[in-house]
């Protein structure tokens, strides 16, 4: 429940995840800047200013500015101004979390195949050296800014309604911002099930250019469209 792909969250233990509002899990933010648009059904964007409510188990000074620019089967994900005072639990941005079947599923980390339950590694992505990950569904992630934790492990959760213990094996990757981050950032590209020819023809860094990435604006130029 902590790691929904694309979200920036404080990783809380299960007992702190329930909504403090009776009858609903929708804790609406006081921040109203959020929206999306599309062009010809092929290109689009989403942007939001994250701001937590002042509620039980929430961190009211948790803020972030997030955007996703979509060009055909590529998504450029940017984050700036990630800030909160929660020094007990870490803040993270999830790349993916997907079910993993031993003997059937594999992931790639910088071109190396990983298929063993218990795999765990921490790597960094930079402008000079992108971190490349492929999930079990042939989606490719290229991290340009961020320290990334990757793992294949058995996880325990709870059924949403009955609270019965549930278990499963998952492959996960997330960008670590640490506890109580100050002006945290991230940048990564998600290439959705690219063909071998697409990967051969273009390097991830060649497909787009970030013109601006700060608290004033997120601006991206896509070179292929």
Regions found by a protein language model. Name each.
Residues 181-192:
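Short Pro-Gly-centered flexible turn/kink motifs
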Residues 1-112:
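Catalytic and substrate-binding regions of extracellular carbohydrate-active enzymes
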Residues 191-225:
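Non-catalytic terminal regions with compositionally biased, polar/charged low complexity
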Residues 50-53, 81-83, 147, 154-156, ...:
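Secondary-structure transition/turn motif
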Residues 32-39, 68-69, 122-124, 131-132, ...:
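Short, exposed beta-strand/loop patches in secreted or surface proteins that constitute
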Residues 53-59, 163-166, 175-181:
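Extracellular beta-rich ligand/substrate-recognition surface
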Residues 46-48, 131-133, 171-176, 218-222:
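Generic recognition of long tandem-repeat/solenoid scaffolds
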Residues 113-174:
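Trp/Gly-enriched beta-strand surface patches
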